[in-house]
Amino acid sequence: TLSLHDALPISQILGQYYQFIRLGFQGYKEVQYNSLTIAKYIHDEIGKMAPFVNYSDEVVNPLFIWYLKPEYARAAKWTLYDLQDKLSQHGWMVPAYTLPSKLEDYVVMRVVVRQGFSRDMADMLLGDIKNAITELEKLDYPTPTRMAQEKNLPVETKIFNHGCRTHKK
């Protein structure tokens, strides 16, 4: 039996069951394959961008994370939190956050490719990332999040941070 009072919403799970029944195994497999293909494309393109390093070399699920190259991060006047804010101005929800305990010094960004996310949308996201980087690189002064990081002060993300508040590197 399913309870509607569980801690996590079940609507997404029910939606997946519905899709699986409606599409069948092969149809659902194709949906997941398409999401994975788009995720690999975005992963590869982000890996080509000068400021970034992908956390892993391959994508096995339709999600991945990346971070600023350490040498780039030391000289940059901005952080991934600033990139998150720029992308949110264009309607993208690409969170920047610290990793969980014992890795909380690392700030990463995450992309999750959901069903229906097309190659055209991926190209729009990549274009918005490139435009945001161009804007951020033109800054004359460090952003408040960059200054806070330099002083080892708490930097709170607006989206998600595993309960960690600081970034020390």
What is each stretch, according to the model?
Residues 103-169:
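PLP-dependent enzyme catalytic core of the Aspartate aminotransferase-like
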Residues 41, 45-49, 82-92, 128-139:
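Generic non-transmembrane alpha-helical segments
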Residues 34-39, 55-65, 100-105, 144-155:
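A glycine-rich phosphate-binding loop feature that marks nucleotide/adenosyl-phosphate handling sites
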Residues 30-34, 47, 58, 79-83, ...:
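Composition- and surface-driven signal marking solvent-exposed, interaction-prone regions
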Residues 52-93, 113, 119, 156-168:
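Conserved PLP-binding catalytic core of the aspartate aminotransferase-like
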Residues 4-61, 67-72:
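Active-site C-terminal subdomain of aminotransferase-like
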Residues 4-9, 84-101:
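Flexible glycine/proline-rich, aromatic-decorated loop/lid segments
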Residues 27-34, 38, 75, 114-117, ...:
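Catalytic cores of large soluble enzymes that bind and process phosphate-bearing ligands
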